[in-house]
From Swiss-Prot:
Site description Discriminates between blocked and unblocked aminoacyl-tRNA, residues in chain: N10
Binding site for tRNA: Y15, Y64, N66, N112
Function: Hydrolyzes ribosome-free peptidyl-tRNAs (with 1 or more amino acids incorporated), which drop off the ribosome during protein synthesis, or as a result of ribosome stalling.
Organism: Amoebophilus asiaticus (strain 5a2)
GO BP terms in the entry: protein quality control for misfolded or incompletely synthesized proteins; rescue of stalled ribosome
Enzyme class: hydrolase
Subunit structure: Monomer.
Subcellular location: Cytoplasm
Record-given protein name: Peptidyl-tRNA hydrolase
Protein backbone atom coordinates (compact mmCIF):
# COMPACT_ATOMS: atom_id res chain seq x y z
CA UNK A 1 0.00 0.00 0.00
CA UNK A 2 1.20 3.52 -0.83
CA UNK A 3 0.93 6.70 1.25
CA UNK A 4 1.77 10.29 0.37
CA UNK A 5 2.90 12.54 3.22
CA UNK A 6 2.78 16.23 2.31
CA UNK A 7 4.79 18.63 4.44
CA UNK A 8 3.69 22.23 3.97
CA UNK A 9 6.26 25.00 3.93
CA UNK A 10 8.20 27.43 1.78
CA UNK A 11 11.45 26.65 0.00
CA UNK A 12 14.56 28.73 0.53
CA UNK A 13 17.11 29.38 3.24
CA UNK A 14 15.21 32.42 4.50
CA UNK A 15 12.27 30.19 5.50
CA UNK A 16 14.24 27.49 7.33
CA UNK A 17 13.17 27.00 10.95
CA UNK A 18 10.17 29.31 10.55
CA UNK A 19 6.83 28.44 12.09
CA UNK A 20 5.18 28.13 8.67
CA UNK A 21 7.75 25.44 7.72
CA UNK A 22 7.04 22.98 10.51
CA UNK A 23 5.69 20.54 7.90
CA UNK A 24 9.09 20.52 6.19
CA UNK A 25 10.84 20.06 9.54
CA UNK A 26 8.73 17.02 10.42
CA UNK A 27 9.45 15.41 7.04
CA UNK A 28 13.17 16.19 7.37
CA UNK A 29 13.21 14.34 10.70
CA UNK A 30 11.26 11.38 9.30
CA UNK A 31 13.62 11.14 6.31
CA UNK A 32 16.65 11.28 8.64
CA UNK A 33 15.21 8.49 10.81
CA UNK A 34 14.90 6.27 7.73
CA UNK A 35 18.22 7.40 6.23
CA UNK A 36 16.74 8.70 2.97
CA UNK A 37 17.49 11.96 1.15
CA UNK A 38 15.16 14.30 -0.70
CA UNK A 39 15.67 14.76 -4.43
CA UNK A 40 14.27 17.54 -6.59
CA UNK A 41 11.54 16.36 -8.93
CA UNK A 42 8.46 17.86 -10.50
CA UNK A 43 6.97 20.54 -8.19
CA UNK A 44 8.52 19.04 -5.04
CA UNK A 45 11.43 17.61 -3.16
CA UNK A 46 10.60 13.92 -2.79
CA UNK A 47 11.89 10.81 -1.07
CA UNK A 48 10.43 7.47 -0.08
CA UNK A 49 10.98 4.51 2.19
CA UNK A 50 9.25 1.28 3.18
CA UNK A 51 7.76 0.84 6.62
CA UNK A 52 6.05 -2.38 7.76
CA UNK A 53 5.12 -3.30 4.20
CA UNK A 54 3.91 0.18 3.27
CA UNK A 55 5.53 2.58 0.82
CA UNK A 56 5.68 6.11 2.22
CA UNK A 57 6.37 8.95 -0.20
CA UNK A 58 7.31 12.26 1.41
CA UNK A 59 6.99 15.52 -0.53
CA UNK A 60 7.98 19.07 0.29
CA UNK A 61 6.33 21.22 -2.41
CA UNK A 62 8.66 23.65 -4.19
CA UNK A 63 5.68 25.76 -5.26
CA UNK A 64 5.68 27.85 -2.08
CA UNK A 65 2.83 27.60 0.39
CA UNK A 66 0.12 29.26 -1.69
CA UNK A 67 0.39 26.68 -4.50
CA UNK A 68 0.98 23.55 -2.40
CA UNK A 69 -2.16 21.98 -3.83
CA UNK A 70 -0.66 21.93 -7.31
CA UNK A 71 2.23 19.75 -6.13
CA UNK A 72 -0.04 17.54 -4.01
CA UNK A 73 -2.44 16.96 -6.90
CA UNK A 74 0.41 16.12 -9.28
CA UNK A 75 1.96 13.51 -6.94
CA UNK A 76 -1.40 12.01 -5.91
CA UNK A 77 -2.16 11.44 -9.60
CA UNK A 78 1.34 10.32 -10.59
CA UNK A 79 1.64 7.80 -7.76
CA UNK A 80 -2.05 6.80 -7.96
CA UNK A 81 -2.60 7.30 -4.23
CA UNK A 82 -6.16 7.73 -2.93
CA UNK A 83 -6.74 10.97 -1.01
CA UNK A 84 -7.52 9.01 2.16
CA UNK A 85 -3.94 7.65 1.98
CA UNK A 86 -2.46 11.14 2.07
CA UNK A 87 -1.51 13.06 5.20
CA UNK A 88 -0.75 16.78 5.16
CA UNK A 89 1.47 18.21 7.92
CA UNK A 90 0.51 21.83 8.58
CA UNK A 91 1.29 24.59 11.07
CA UNK A 92 -1.69 25.76 13.14
CA UNK A 93 -2.04 29.05 15.02
CA UNK A 94 -5.15 27.84 16.86
CA UNK A 95 -3.26 25.11 18.72
CA UNK A 96 -0.84 25.73 21.59
CA UNK A 97 2.85 25.43 20.75
CA UNK A 98 3.82 21.78 20.20
CA UNK A 99 0.25 20.42 20.39
CA UNK A 100 -0.64 17.90 17.67
CA UNK A 101 -4.12 17.21 16.33
CA UNK A 102 -4.95 14.61 13.65
CA UNK A 103 -8.10 15.14 11.59
CA UNK A 104 -9.64 13.21 8.66
CA UNK A 105 -10.93 16.45 7.09
CA UNK A 106 -11.75 20.06 7.88
CA UNK A 107 -11.71 23.63 6.70
CA UNK A 108 -8.63 25.61 5.76
CA UNK A 109 -9.18 27.94 8.76
CA UNK A 110 -7.60 30.68 6.65
CA UNK A 111 -4.36 28.74 6.02
CA UNK A 112 -3.21 29.45 2.45
CA UNK A 113 -1.55 26.06 2.01
CA UNK A 114 -4.76 24.27 2.98
CA UNK A 115 -6.80 26.62 0.77
CA UNK A 116 -4.60 25.60 -2.15
CA UNK A 117 -5.07 21.91 -1.37
CA UNK A 118 -8.85 22.38 -1.26
CA UNK A 119 -8.76 24.23 -4.58
CA UNK A 120 -6.69 21.60 -6.41
CA UNK A 121 -8.16 18.50 -4.75
CA UNK A 122 -11.74 19.85 -4.93
CA UNK A 123 -12.47 18.68 -1.40
CA UNK A 124 -11.88 19.39 2.28
CA UNK A 125 -11.93 15.64 2.97
CA UNK A 126 -8.23 14.87 3.18
CA UNK A 127 -6.35 13.88 6.35
CA UNK A 128 -4.16 16.47 8.04
CA UNK A 129 -1.90 16.60 11.07
CA UNK A 130 -2.12 20.04 12.62
CA UNK A 131 1.02 21.12 14.49
CA UNK A 132 0.50 23.90 17.02
CA UNK A 133 2.82 26.89 16.62
CA UNK A 134 1.13 29.07 19.22
CA UNK A 135 -0.26 32.55 18.64
CA UNK A 136 2.00 34.96 20.49
CA UNK A 137 1.59 37.95 18.19
CA UNK A 138 -0.16 41.31 18.29
CA UNK A 139 -3.23 42.07 16.20
CA UNK A 140 -2.40 42.38 12.51
CA UNK A 141 0.96 40.60 12.84
CA UNK A 142 -0.15 37.06 11.96
CA UNK A 143 1.79 36.94 8.68
CA UNK A 144 4.98 38.16 10.32
CA UNK A 145 4.51 35.65 13.13
CA UNK A 146 4.11 32.55 10.94
CA UNK A 147 7.10 33.59 8.83
CA UNK A 148 9.27 34.25 11.90
CA UNK A 149 11.86 31.78 13.12
CA UNK A 150 11.25 29.83 16.28
CA UNK A 151 12.86 31.38 19.36
CA UNK A 152 15.86 29.52 20.81
CA UNK A 153 13.86 28.27 23.81
CA UNK A 154 11.13 27.02 21.44
CA UNK A 155 13.64 25.20 19.24
CA UNK A 156 14.80 23.21 22.25
CA UNK A 157 11.18 22.16 22.90
CA UNK A 158 10.40 21.14 19.29
CA UNK A 159 12.24 17.81 19.33
CA UNK A 160 9.56 15.95 21.27
CA UNK A 161 6.50 17.04 19.22
CA UNK A 162 8.41 16.56 15.95
CA UNK A 163 9.33 13.02 17.02
CA UNK A 164 5.71 12.43 18.05
CA UNK A 165 4.53 13.69 14.64
CA UNK A 166 6.84 11.15 12.96
CA UNK A 167 5.31 8.37 15.06
CA UNK A 168 1.82 9.56 14.14
CA UNK A 169 2.70 9.45 10.42
CA UNK A 170 3.91 5.87 10.72
CA UNK A 171 0.87 4.89 12.80
CA UNK A 172 -1.42 6.50 10.21
CA UNK A 173 0.12 4.28 7.54
CA UNK A 174 -0.17 1.06 9.55
CA UNK A 175 -3.17 1.45 11.89
CA UNK A 176 -5.25 3.94 9.90
CA UNK A 177 -6.56 7.34 10.81
CA UNK A 178 -9.27 6.32 13.29
CA UNK A 179 -7.05 4.29 15.62
CA UNK A 180 -4.22 6.80 15.30
CA UNK A 181 -6.59 9.69 16.12
CA UNK A 182 -7.84 7.85 19.20
CA UNK A 183 -4.27 7.62 20.46
CA UNK A 184 -2.73 10.93 19.44
CA UNK A 185 -5.71 13.22 20.04
CA UNK A 186 -6.08 11.77 23.53
CA UNK A 187 -2.42 12.65 24.18
CA UNK A 188 -1.52 8.98 24.56
CA UNK A 189 2.02 8.21 23.43
CA UNK A 190 2.17 6.42 20.08
CA UNK A 191 4.60 3.49 20.27
Amino acid sequence: MKYLIIGLGNIGHEYELTRHNIGFQVLDQLAAEHQVKFQIDRLALITSFSYKGRSLYLIKPTTYMNLSGKAAQYWINKLKIPIENTLTIVDDLALPFGKLRLRPQGSSAGHNGLKSLEEYLKTQAYPRLRFGIGNDFTKGQQSNYVLSRFKDQELSLLESPINQACKIIKSFSTLGITRTMEQCNADVSIT
